[in-house]
């Protein structure tokens, strides 16, 4: 089966991890984030519902990209929200840097994964 990585454990990332797990589209979902402890706690919550909701997919929370090794699909939900006074170009620059860094880290551990970017549409070309 497929290994799926979700980068970003915020609202979009954690919901994506839950939905992929519930649908049994993958044998393993790895959720990673820069906030220490966040993806681990969310993974525990999702895993606790496995037996009640009757799905087999295991969810792993981590802050270490090496645990994403062998991912066939990567969903990038990481990014910062627009802050008051921030222009769209400033937001683009910040989030483009995040997507570039995430992509560099992912390809260190997974060869030729399918990458899905869930963020501002203007960032899609960054991950190519």
Residue map of PLM features:
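Glycine/threonine-rich flexible loop motifs
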Residues: 83-95
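N-terminal Rossmann-fold NAD(P) dinucleotide-binding loop
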Residues: 13-14
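Conserved NAD(P)H cofactor-binding loop of Rossmann-fold oxidoreductase domains
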Residues: 78-80
């Amino acid at each position: 089966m497929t290994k799926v990585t979700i980068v970003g454990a915020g609202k979009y990332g954690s919901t994506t991890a839950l939905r992929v797990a519930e649908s049994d589209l993958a044998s393993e979902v790895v959720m990673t984030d820069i906030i220490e402890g966040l993806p681990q706690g969310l993974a525990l919550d999702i895993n606790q519902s496995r037996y009640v909701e009757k799905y087999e997919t295991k969810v792993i929370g981590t802050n270490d990209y090496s645990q994403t090794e062998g991912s066939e699909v990567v969903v990038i939900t990481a990014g910062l929200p627009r802050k008051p006074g921030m222009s769209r170009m400033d937001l683009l620059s910040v989030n483009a840097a995040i997507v570039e860094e995430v992509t560099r880290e992912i390809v260190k551990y997974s060869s030729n994964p399918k990458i899905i970017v869930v963020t501002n549409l203007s960032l899609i070309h960054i991950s190519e």
